[in-house]
Amino acid sequence: MRDSFLKSSPVSQVTSSSSIPLDEAVIQRLIDLAEDAGRAILSFYEQDAEVREKSDASPLTAADLASHHEIMQGLKALMPSVPVLSEESAPINAVERLAWSTFWLVDPLDGTKEFLQRNGEFTVNIALIDHHMPSLGIVHVPAQKRTYVGRVGDGAFLLGPDRRKTSIRISEEAQDPLRVLGSRSHPTPDLDAYLLDQGAFVMEAVGSSLKFCRVAEGSADLYPRFGPTSEWDTAAGQAVLEAAGVTSLTFRAVRFGTISIPVC
């Protein structure tokens, strides 16, 4: 995905809504589920983790799997008829998956490298995809006890450690110098070349989907991403961004569940 998430003025054309009933009680249950998964992750946080390498060379730990099982069980109990695609799911036949009109898209532990480094910048991502677009996104940051929630067309909010609910919105104007976020684990030469054309900027390295949320809450201006990334890495963050009013000269809202391999 080669999209730059730069906030400027609120976007008006994003009106996606879910065909699944999402009242406040359902959204609260989803928040609780993300936070339960976060607690499962934190139960491993201070331990020396055994790390396995997946086929794509990314790391896998017991914390990834504990969060995965927590979320899978919770979503199946909440909405048994809605399929779930998780990063840690067993492979699902592409023909079957591409026929889904509505499904959950989950990254049970985004930022496993950040988890292993114990820097607190890892997240739990839960998104509802409806007709290829995210209509709801929940990004929970377990180590910070912060949960970002975005319902496209209905706004975004943050639940902080004090459980206070605060509406979030992108800043109306980019700052000078531009506040830019980059990946802590995946720096690229393309990013360096891109930033040469952006004028004055201050770069901050941040892990996981927390970067999306930083732009959504207005504490950063730009998150450029170059190279491939998986759909479960971006779906929940995209929903939070859109709900918070993101727009950009280069922002392209990614459509999900349209290709046989979930990479965008």
Residue ranges and their predicted role:
Residues 86-88, 207, 252:
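Short loop/edge segments at beta-strand edges and connector loops
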Residues 2-109, 193-196:
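N-terminal subdomain of lithium-sensitive/metallo-dependent phosphomonoesterases centered on the IMPase/IPPase/PAP
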Residues 126-213, 222:
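Acidic beta-strand-loop-alpha-helix segment within the catalytic core
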Residues 100-144:
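Glycine-rich active-site/cofactor-binding loop and its immediate structural neighborhood
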Residues 1-32, 193-197, 212-264:
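Oxyanion/phosphate-interacting regions
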Residues 41, 64, 75, 112, ...:
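Residue-level signal for inorganic ion chemistry
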